[in-house]
Structure formats: C-alpha cells, structure tokens
Amino acid sequence: VLRDSDGEVAFSALPFSYEYAAREVFGDETISTPADVIEAQLTAARAHVPKGARWVVVAHAFVAGGAVGETERALTRVGGIETVPAEVFEGADYVSLGHLHKPQEVGSANIRYSGAPLAFGFDEAGDQKSMTIVDVKKDGIDVRTVPFRPLRQVRSLTGVFADILAGTPTDDFVQVILTDEIPLIDPMKRLRATYPNAC
C-alpha cells in the first residue's frame, strides 16, 4: 500500500498459477479454470485492500478479447484455449496485464496490456513500441502512452541476393527471404557484412 495526495493505493501482484497449484494453495478443489485461479487470487488480495483505497491489480493472464500475435502462445489446456473474462477484475481501479505483446485495452479502459518493449518476432515489424503511464486518481484513471524506438527494430526483406546486399546497412534484426532461382553459396555470411543481425 502506497500513499499519495489522494490517499492510499493498494497494489496486488498476482503470479501466474496453474489450477493444480492454486487448488493446493487455496485449499479449494473446485478451482478448475484460469478464471477460477484469478478469482481466488483476487478474493485473497481484496481482503488486504484498505477501505477507501484505490486498487491496482498486476497479473499475467490471457484475457478474452486480446489481440494475439505470432510469437505469443495461447495458454492452452486440454479442451482448448483458456481465457479469463475481463469481468473477473471488477472492483479494481486499474488492471495492468502481461502476456500479449501489443499494447491494448481489453474489456474496458481500466484493463490494459502495456505491450512488450522489444519485438519478439518478425510479425511485429513496423509496430510502434510504447510505454504506458497510468495516473490512478481518486475520481478515475488517466492513461497515456509514450512511444519510443528500441535500439534495434525488426525488419523483413524479400528479394534477390544482389539487391538485398546492396541495401542500406543496419544493425536491426533482419529476416532475409531470398527469391533467387539458383542456389547461393553461404549467402548469410555475405549478408552479415551489411546486416550483422540478419537471420
């Protein structure tokens, strides 16, 4: 619990947990889904939030409605992908989520993935990276994003070897897809002279 000019702000950090572990920790054999796990964690956390305090929840979860990229794996269980409905977070003033790489709101403006600061795959080429700044006020939240450019971007280049080799040198992470019709001998070694982080 922290204090600012508007009073107390309680923070609850919920660790990712599988159902079997949550059943043991909470002594509740009815926990059978990721939503049940989050609900049990929130019930326990809520008991420690002082009356009148604003409440910020931090969680690693796959919340229904989130936009998934190529490199994020769904939290899959027997029977399908298990998502957590946004409604389980009702009562929290702000929910800061981790798992999905693209910054996005899920369910409502106070439930948000901040996004990954670095690209994890070439499907994220061209995505604007940002950080999320949240002001949790007594009368609501103010969310703003601050865009930034990581030291290295990810890019995908497609074309014939000679054209790509003649491109502008960069330290970015570059995926190279060659379209030459004849086999080339060790093209990667030569490409790395121009693109040291090519793959």
What residue spans do the PLM features occupy?
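Extended recognition/assembly regions associated with phosphoester-bond processing machinery
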Residues: 1-199
